[in-house]
């Protein structure tokens, strides 16, 4: 299907239900799908979503609550250090998770290809939280966050925003929740989101390697 036809179909797709189903997750298809605002959520079959409205966060608009300031520099930050361990932790920390073995295998492949990235938090060399997602152009497509220690996921988002601020990024948070709203995220229409992707996914990120943003 041509890009223009897919764009038109997505504008009229269901707002709060899957747009379509697939039997398997394929790394190459995921990269293409993300540029059209689609993301997988649950497997067997894989459900593909493009919700309307869409929750996004501008790194320059991150809200840092007063009670968070004491946590910001409490943990060591590492980038792309142990992606596999972080995504596994995101799965294991939840009693019910869409992140199954197929998700882990596929997203780890995307990591080895340079698309998927992780920001990890450590305390005494122990992984205690973080966030992972895909970077395409100037968009960070957030997939999942986790915290083992108090406020670790919030610190991860704050640190991610700090790193991406100089590069005019937008962070895709997928679906609204109060936790994200407190941090400065907000909803926009699907049409506005897809227009942002048209522009930003075709731009250079502005840096060579994500992991080198922390020296």
Swiss-Prot record:
CC terms in the record's Gene Ontology section:
cytoplasm
**Record keywords:** Acyltransferase, Cytoplasm, Transferase
Localization (cell): Cytoplasm
* One Pfam assignment: Leu_Phe_trans
Entry's Gene Ontology BP terms = protein catabolic process
Instruction: Give the chief site where it resides.
Output: cytoplasm
Q: What are the GO MF terms of this UniProt record?
A: leucyl-tRNA--protein transferase activity
What does the record give as the reaction this protein catalyses?
Answer: N-terminal L-lysyl-[protein] + L-leucyl-tRNA(Leu) = N-terminal L-leucyl-L-lysyl-[protein] + tRNA(Leu) + H(+); N-terminal L-arginyl-[protein] + L-leucyl-tRNA(Leu) = N-terminal L-leucyl-L-arginyl-[protein] + tRNA(Leu) + H(+); L-phenylalanyl-tRNA(Phe) + an N-terminal L-alpha-aminoacyl-[protein] = an N-terminal L-phenylalanyl-L-alpha-aminoacyl-[protein] + tRNA(Phe)
Tell me the function of this protein. Answer: Functions in the N-end rule pathway of protein degradation where it conjugates Leu, Phe and, less efficiently, Met from aminoacyl-tRNAs to the N-termini of proteins containing an N-terminal arginine or lysine.
Check the UniProt entry and state the signal peptide residues, or none.
none
The record's HAMAP family line, in alphabetical order, gives: Leu_Phe_trans (MF_00688)
- UniProt EC number: 2.3.2.6
Q: Which Gene3D superfamilies match?
A: Leucyl/phenylalanyl-tRNA-protein transferase, C-terminal domain (3.40.630.70), Leucyl/phenylalanyl-tRNA-protein transferase, N-terminal domain (3.30.70.3550)
The keyword Transmembrane appears for this protein: no
Q: Which family does it belong to?
A: Belongs to the L/F-transferase family.
For this entry, the protein name equals Leucyl/phenylalanyl-tRNA--protein transferase
NCBIfam families registered for this protein in UniProt: aat (TIGR00667)
InterPro entries from the UniProt entry:
Acyl_CoA_acyltransferase, Leu/Phe-tRNA_Trfase, Leu/Phe-tRNA_Trfase_C, Leu/Phe-tRNA_Trfase_N
């Amino acid at each position: 299907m041509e890009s223009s036809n897919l764009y038109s179909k997505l504008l009229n797709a269901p707002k709060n239900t899957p747009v379509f189903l697939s039997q398997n997750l394929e790394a190459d298809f995921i990269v293409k799908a993300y540029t059209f605002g689609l993301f997988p959520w649950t497997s067997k079959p894989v459900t593909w979503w493009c919700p309307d409205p869409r929750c996004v966060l501008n790194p320059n608009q991150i809200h840092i609550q007063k009670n968070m300031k004491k946590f910001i520099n409490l943990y060591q930050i590492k980038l792309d250090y142990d992606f596999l361990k972080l995504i596994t932790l995101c799965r294991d920390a939840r009693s019910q998770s869409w992140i199954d073995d197929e998700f882990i295998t596929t997203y780890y492949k995307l990591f080895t290809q340079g698309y998927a990235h992780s920001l990890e938090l450590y305390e005494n060399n122990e992984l205690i939280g973080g966030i992972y997602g895909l970077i395409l152009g100037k968009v960070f497509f957030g997939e999942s966050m986790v915290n083992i220690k108090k406020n670790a996921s919030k610190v991860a988002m704050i640190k991610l925003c700090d790193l991406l601020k100089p590069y005019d990024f937008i962070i895709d948070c997928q679906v609204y929740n109060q936790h994200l709203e407190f941090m400065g995220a907000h909803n926009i229409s699907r049409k506005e989101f897809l227009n942002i992707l048209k522009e930003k996914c075709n731009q250079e990120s502005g840096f060579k390697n994500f992991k080198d943003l922390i020296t």
